[in-house]
Amino acid sequence: MLACLMAACATTPPSGSGSATNGSARNAKIAVVAAENFWGSIAAQLGGERVTVRSIIRSPDADPHDYEPTAADARAVAVAQYVVENGAGYDPWVAKLVAANPAPARSVLNVGKLVGVKEGGNPHLWYSPHDVRQVIEQISADYKRIDPADSTYFDQQKQNYETQGLARYVQLIADIKSTYSGTPIGASESIVTPLAEDLLLKVATPESFLDAISEGTDPTTADKITADEQIKTKQVKIFIFNSQNSTPDVAALVTEAKNAGIPVATVTETLVPATASFQDWQVGQLEGIKQALSKATTP
């Protein structure tokens, strides 16, 4: 019951009794805007030829936290039937953009609300395989509500994505869980935490250090010393860092890890390359983590 309530409040449905069949009535594709390209990739693959998807954040150099929407972004949202925002305080500019461009037949999916993460929680929801599965379910359900005439098509798209598109992603997660569960790791910021939790890896780096780097503030001296000592004394087996947010403190830890012979794996905030699919991007990173763990635990 709780999951149903969360799903219901996460998507703001369109008002008006006839809006659910609006897309099929015009025999037009559903116009979708995703705040970030990782959600946009999933939305595009679930919708196939029945949707058009525009991702606002699609450059590796853009910072979703403080992005300034353009006139083109506003125009895209103005005509969108469906908007996907991360929520949880990650992209507050989306709500402002939607409010400034009202449309009675538009639905908005707030991923944070869907999975129960409020502002102040860890907003890196796309790094949680569990949350990703919930998003897939919700987007597919929303497509069928917006365009019920194509429900069978959307069901098939979802099945293909889950059984084929995500097959390697799911397998790598299972492999890492079964082989390296409980392994202590170091990390540069909280973007790593949701994935590590699902992989059953133990993040040893102080949580306050991870949060500081993610939020763009300076870690405390005590946290810096702790993170450094964990590497020097090899309390962590590998170190994972976000290469799109490499501060001097993070760079120092990466160098320290390499000097100590601790394998280093890399993740990024958004799709790299920008044209990659969600699953190809994640698979590449998971393979890097798996290789680092293998190297660290091989005598």
Outline where the language-model segments fall.
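Extracytoplasmic metal-acquisition and chelation regions
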Residues: 9-299
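C-terminal motif of bacterial Sec signal peptides marking the signal peptidase cleavage site
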Residues: 4-8
